Amino acid sequence: MTVVTRATTPQPFTDSGVTLLPNYFTGLVPPTPLRSDIDIDACPTATRTLMQFADNLGRAVGYDRERGGQVIQDIFPVRSTEHQQVSSSSKVVLGSHTESAFHPHKPRYVVLLCLRGD
């Protein structure tokens, strides 16, 4: 018999509203892709875990201007952009920014899941 459990989202641990949920099983993590022009669900178990937490906060949505409206965006480092100010960089600290600052329907939450710090 399989027992399905629902991920629960605790109250924020900090005054800034950040909640850190370490050590959740995300399945096997594949090698980092060599190119950024591929559309993959690199880790389906991680995607389901992320969506379970997001579902507790509200309805997950995507914006047309951000990766064509994808709700889940697999972002991974790419060697050719490692020193640039882009989402696929890995050797620089990204500057603080938002793509939806002037959108009439701003997000209330941003949910991030890190699979590997490479």
Residue ranges and their predicted role:
Residues 1-118:
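Fe(II)/2-oxoglutarate oxygenase catalytic core
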